[in-house]
Amino acid sequence: MITRIFILAISLCIFQATVAQPKVLYDVVLTGGRVIDPETKLDTIKNVGIINNRIAQISSEPLKGKEMINVAGLVVAPGFIDLHVHGRTNQEQEYQLHDGVTTALELEWGIEHLGKWYASRQGKALINYGASVNWPYERFKAINKYKDGVNKLYQTSIKGESTIEEMTNTILPAATEQLTAEEISKTHNNIKSALSEGGIGIGVPIGYLPKTNPKEMYAVFQLAGEMNALVFTHVRNPDIISIQEVIADAILTNAPLHIVHINSMSLGNIQLGLDMVSAAQQKGFKITTELYPYTAGSTSLQSAMFSDGWQERLGISYDGLQWVATGERLTKETFDVYRKTGGVVILHVMKPEWIKTGIAAPGVIIASDGMPYAKLAHPRTAGTFSRVLGKYVREDKVIDLMTAIEKMTLLPAKRLEDIAPMMRFKGRIQVGADADITIFNPNTIIDKATFEKGLEFSAGIEYVMVNGTFVLRKGKTVAAVYPGQPVYGKFKK
């Protein structure tokens, strides 16, 4: 309701301006497109007028613009919002852009030295960006004996050169540490400080620190509940008990919770995992989840996920692991070598029917878990949203177009509105909303990246506008344009 009031207020101001000036000249007019707004359920042919960074008019009547773009036969949708990415540079953002993404956020892990990172991206980003507080790193900082690792990461972070793989490998020695009460208190103070730098909630990837004491985990949720700070979590193990753990912690502390990639966290029990989330929602708890539309996951081979017993936990063996650097399937011998040297693997662990179940489930958000750039990186890095629209909407008819767009735009925007108020103006095609707009051909959109060929731009995304500026035109990236803006959490000072 508050969101609608904000947008209506801006709409009224724009309306009054257009009444006073009946011959309004818009900066850009999108003509004749199929306009879809998942909040109002608008799905019809309209013209869209844009002034500066806002949608100023949506009309069946002709509009006049400085630039007129004919989008007949194309869908005009809110820009896609990705809650779960790990790429930190424009190299990854360009693939996301060609997948229709206008806002890409690192919320599972978060980012260390948030203030420095936000500053390093200012005026340089293709699309909107933001991140949560990196709980593993703030925890790591609280342990005195790891000061050298803290300093190393600081130097790369302030240059904008740190990667999630470097960060995870640096903090790995602390993954098994049992924190004292004093260290837990320091961690919480670190979290509060990082939230004040703009962090969008708290990234708690407990699956990478699975030996963390449940008492320490519960304390993090208590802090989140007290502050009403959204927790994003990769659960302890890929099983139902781990999903129960975080839901229980969230319910007992009243902490808002988002469980990442439930498809790979619940594996063969995805319906039960979804039922648990739904039951919590029906009781009034702010708990949500997401998935990506692929049957394989991806992560660092040096992570705690591959500690003793990983085959039993994941239900695969060495040949279910694919080495990103070369595309080869692993053996025991190569596994042992690469586990020492470090790098990223793809885990072929899921079945197609599990993905369909998750995509069809009401309220489940689409998010990519896109990886840092490598030619053979997981294809979800480049094709998540186009794959949903091409395969699961057009080809397999698992969900309809309106529902798919809702899962990619309105649902992630609404999930973040409490923690990041600026998201109230995203995920919508409405007068007064931000002009983050993705325009695609519903008959041709499809992902092109594969496990074998590696990353490729998706097909069918024709235009992408970020904050009123075109970043993609006729399927081509616009050179030297960087309209992406930071998305900050509500605690920023």
Model-identified regions with their sequence ranges:
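Active-site-adjacent beta->alpha loops and helix N-cap segments on the catalytic face
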Residues: I111-W117, P210-V220, S242-I243
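Conserved beta-strand scaffold positions in the cores of enzyme catalytic domains, especially
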Residues: M68-N70, F80, Y129-A131, T288, ...
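Active-site neighborhoods of metal-dependent hydrolases
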Residues: K145-M217, I247-I251, P256-L401
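Divalent metal-dependent hydrolysis catalytic cores, especially in the metallo-beta-lactamase
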Residues: E94-G115, L126-Y137, L195-L209, E226-R236, ...
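Sec-dependent signal peptide recognition
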Residues: M1-L8
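Active-site microenvironment of metallo-dependent hydrolases
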Residues: F6, A17-K46, I51, S60-E61, ...
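Metal-associated gating/positioning segment near the N- to mid-region
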Residues: E61-K124
